[in-house]
């Protein structure tokens, strides 16, 4: 039986590098999706093809980390995680199509892993709840691919819903829906892809995580979330000033997530926009994960009339989001494109986006 299963990319509205620190984040699922079509066969491997790559990749069912590389490593990681958890995985043919841009900060990797997990589960009739699937996906990305990411991307892809943001508490692993419908207030969410690609399997992401872990160790706690209620004064016990700056971002970002959710409850997109900009400034000054190109896009959007703008995703490239009054959206988009080209960068791809459904079988 052939099955098709789709999983979305995501935009993290606010709450960057907070997930592995057991803090808060507020993502939405995107209308852009990765779809995996899987036909089980009596073979000892899965042959995978992607519309993003030439040729095919052979994934042995007994694959181990490091055996499959490149784009296919994410699919192989999903297979490895499923089998490691005792779930059945048959051989077969797998076809992958996607309109989630790779390296744009929209979590193309989580969309691919989630779609593979869903397709194999649907083909075998295996019922796996969403939280377990998120943990399997994280294990695939952490331990097979080698990207030290948290649960954010996978929870967003699995729990996403139309006109809904997800307030995630990573200490308790709870997901609370928060109404997110800016169009109802004549505000649009602009997604501005810088076309500067990034990769979480690279070293900078891991360095930020290690810095946060050192800061927590200096404070005598297992995660920075444990000192959230103590305020910034607690950071004086952190030995390394760079580690202290990283921790300051995490604590202030957690509060911004909660304040952003409160602003949404009041339909106060002016306040929400200001929090986006404050988040970007914190990522630039304290966490040092933005780039000159990304900063230019965010700052140009605000100067042109956006209520606020910030980089979304793990950093070092990718995309910027902005909340913009609907009647200013075209001017903001034109200004951002012009500013980037004038500075010698590729023209950003600017589009309106919205909160969309999460992962599901394609019927």
From Swiss-Prot:
The keyword Kinase applies. Gene3D superfamilies: 3.30.230.10, GHMP kinase, C-terminal domain. Keywords: ATP-binding, Carbohydrate metabolism, Cytoplasm, Galactose metabolism, Kinase, Magnesium, Metal-binding, Nucleotide-binding, Transferase. Mg(2+) binds at residues 109, 141. Pathway: Carbohydrate metabolism; galactose metabolism. The keyword Magnesium applies. Catalyzes the transfer of the gamma-phosphate of ATP to D-galactose to form alpha-D-galactose-1-phosphate (Gal-1-P). This is Galactokinase. It comes from Mycobacterium tuberculosis (strain ATCC 25618 / H37Rv). The lineage of its organism: Bacteria, Bacillati, Actinomycetota, Actinomycetes, Mycobacteriales.
